[in-house]
């Protein structure tokens, strides 16, 4: 369990690194604002992911990981874009096959969802997924993997519930 951006990035980056070996990565976040804070204007600010990811994932450091985080006066679902530079290129078909297996029946099951096409952000309001990816927008150019998704920033409580349920099973 972590912040909404930590929940969106860390399990995904761990999986991609273990499967395809990450050289460097950057994340672009356009983050919503809670309704009671809407009077604030567009701001760039620090994101929990900037510090947490490099502490949680030993293959990342300040020299190979960047987060661009912008808060916008909007109460809907947030947008997150990932870029991973891989040690060696893989085909889009190979990546999608492995990734779809991982989110359907594998190590990422229950954490991530994927839509074939972009059906807009608001359908992902109150989702239980840390990120909902858009399959048609997943691209590989050279050894760079690009992924776009939506996440409900106010709903990272789902990962807390997962953590509590996990802890309960460990103490029974």
Model regions and ranges:
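C-terminal substrate-binding/catalytic lobe of Rossmann-fold NAD(P)-dependent oxidoreductases
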Residues: 23-24, 28-151
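N-terminal Rossmann-like NAD(P) cofactor-binding subdomain of oxidoreductases
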Residues: 1-36, 151-153, 163-171
């Amino acid at each position: 369990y972590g912040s909404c951006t930590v929940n969106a990035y860390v399990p995904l980056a761990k999986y991609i690194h273990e499967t395809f070996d990450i050289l460097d990565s950057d994340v672009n976040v356009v983050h919503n604002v809670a309704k009671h804070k809407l009077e604030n204007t567009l701001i760039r600010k620090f994101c929990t992911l900037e510090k947490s990811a490099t502490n949680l994932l030993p293959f990342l450091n300040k020299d190979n990981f960047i987060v661009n985080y912008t808060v916008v006066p909007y109460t809907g679902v947030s947008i997150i874009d990932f870029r991973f530079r891989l040690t060696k290129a893989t085909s889009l078909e190979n990546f999608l096959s492995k990734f779809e297996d991982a989110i359907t029946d594998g190590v990422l099951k229950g954490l991530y969802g994927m839509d074939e096409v972009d059906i807009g952000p608001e359908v992902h309001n109150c989702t239980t997924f840390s990120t909902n990816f858009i399959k048609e927008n997943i691209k590989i150019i050279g050894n760079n993997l690009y992924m776009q998704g939506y996440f409900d920033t106010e709903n990272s409580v789902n990962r807390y519930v997962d953590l509590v349920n996990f802890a309960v099973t460990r103490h029974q």
